[in-house]
A protein has these predicted regions:
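A SIS-like phosphosugar-recognition module
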Residues: 1-152
């Protein structure tokens, strides 16, 4: 988690059903650890966000075994080539992931597409949790957040 807490910013990438999970992961890191993080659709990297990649920047890549897997891995290789430290979250085994220079890999259990989003979300929640703990923040009482939001 220090890679994320010490960085100027981080990026979360996903395609298909993993894109909203990437957004949620970035949001949780912002809400709990007060670290700048943004979620982006992996397929849109060449339209701007790729320019934000700096050497050592932490990037979470959600790459479940789905129709977008190969394209997501290609996007991951692009950010690695620009110096990003990639945390890959996938339901493929390390031996099946054909990419070198991945900083960390978290392999979740394989499940059907209805359940897989839950399995991909847990590592992101733990990342935010441990990042907040490392910085000494109260996980149960994030600043400026309420359990319910009402607008009148």
């Amino acid at each position: 988690s220090s890679t994320f807490t010490d960085a100027k910013g981080s990026m979360f990438l996903g395609r298909g059903f993993s894109y909203p999970i990437a957004l949620e992961g970035a949001l949780k890191l912002k809400e709990l650890a007060y670290v700048h993080a943004e979620g982006y659709p992996a397929g849109e990297m060449k339209h701007g966000p790729l320019a934000l990649i700096e050497d050592g920047m932490p990037v979470v890549v959600l790459a479940p075994r789905d129709n977008y897997y190969q394209k997501t891995i290609s996007n991951m290789q692009e950010v690695i080539a620009r110096g990003a430290k990639v945390l890959l979250i996938t339901n493929k085994s390390k031996d099946e992931v054909m990419s070198e220079n991945i900083w960390q890999t978290i392999e979740v259990e394989s499940a059907n597409e209805d359940l897989l989003p839950f399995l991909l979300t847990v590592p992101l929640q733990k990342l935010a949790y441990y990042s907040a703990l490392k910085k000494g923040y109260d996980i149960d009482k994030p600043r400026n957040l309420a359990k319910s939001v009402t607008v009148e």
